[in-house]
Amino acid sequence: MRAGHRAPSQTHRRPSGGSKRPGRPRRTGRAPPNRPGHHIHTTPSTAAPDERHTGVTMQSRTDAHETVDTAFLAELRSRTPADRVLTSGPEYTRALALFNAAVGVRPSVVVRCASTADVRAGVRASRNHGVPLSVRGGGHDFWGRAFRPGGLVLDLTEMRDVQVDVNHGYATVGGGALSSDVVSAAERAGLTAVTGTAGSVGMVGLTLGGGYGPLLGQFGLAADNLLSAEVVLADGSRVNTDAEHHPDLFWALGGGGGNFGVVTSARIRLHRVPTVISGTILYPIDQSAGILADLGGTLQDSPDELTVDVGFLPGPDGKPTVYVAPTWSGNLEAGNAQNGPVRTLAGLGTPVLAEIGPVARSATLAATDAMFPPGRMGAIRTRTVQSVTGSIATVLGRAAREFTSPFSAIVWHQFHGAATRPTLGSTAFGRREPHLMVELICMWENGENKDHTGGGEDRSSHLRWLEETHAALEPFSLPGGYVNFLGPETPDQVANSYGPNTERLLAVKSAVDPDSVFSATPLPTSTAGA
């Protein structure tokens, strides 16, 4: 299992790319031969079956679209193909499908964007008529920020083009491209991208918030691999930004979240690591004290090539287990050696499961997606700790023994190596010292509730478990947290998440979006908590 790094739907952010307007993008057949300088271009199908689930913020869905301003609709339809402007019907209903079925917000209008021009038209119409704006990329955000009540959604799920430049080692990805789209295209060229652990997460949303993942020890965060971006600003204008052009905006995109515009396409650095040594090791929870103590030293001393996720999740028999998920991105022979740094992790105790070996990165993403399928209800919280001390292990072990659902999990993600080397302030990401990002995931089935009003199985016990665990970790935690997992219910963490970057981020925000058109990812209102 890999807890995916879910990014806030690009509401108030979500990149998009491509310029095809009519209909659905085509999926190309065979990949062209891998030749130096050759460009590999793929356009995935726009509506993968695993994206068809419903949800949003634990609210009832109301027919907000019935009150849509006619002048607003008229402007939208004059600027975009009418069949792409949805206010009701089967296509509109399908467009409401998000990863988290607990979300209940209903937008008034969905525009299925096929180009940057569609995005610009939507932004301008929204501003002209005072309609709240949001952006949907991967739709994986637990908080459901792809939608705003009664608002306009710029749906980028058809903007999933991925173009790989083999010679220069980068990919240009559309704003709606999923992590799996990018990794699959890169693999055909013998390359890979820095992503999180789940393939169904939007690539741009992940990157804008930072992007923890199993390759960060060797290659840094996803945000550290951003080379340039095309951005539609709050006034509807389009800019191309990189380290030399609009450098303040480019800096803000590297971890400042989706606060500055709609990223319609992004160019990201690729790496020649299509195959890794990876797997899952599960230990009985009664061995947790010794295993976590041993892992503490391993995480502190691990080489850049080895990044390890650790945590608790229900095992095959439903009982909680200690979960260890290593990823080795270095020399395969060294990583796969019996006495090497990866396989020794299976000897910390007596595992109930130990599956480790060479695997394509696309397969690791697919495995996480299979463990966390769309359509369940859920909520998330996060903390940041320097290390897993005995006190923290006790808190998390107790929480694991009290799991209220077989679909919940606790995972901490290692932050080390290359990710720690950029100076604080060189990007907008607010923390560069070694640490562990703790992900508390609470998920449960929707039960028999078929109208998607946020009910189904009683959620009170699940949410109580989540909030109590989150609170119990606070005394041992560093200020702030990972912005892609923070929402309106965690304002104190938001205020401390950007550190000394807060003042500069607010200055960029004031320059490019003074009216806060984009606001999905939390941004402090002042430097008071920074």
How should these model regions be labeled?
Residues 1-37, 44-49:
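Compositionally biased, low-complexity flexible segments
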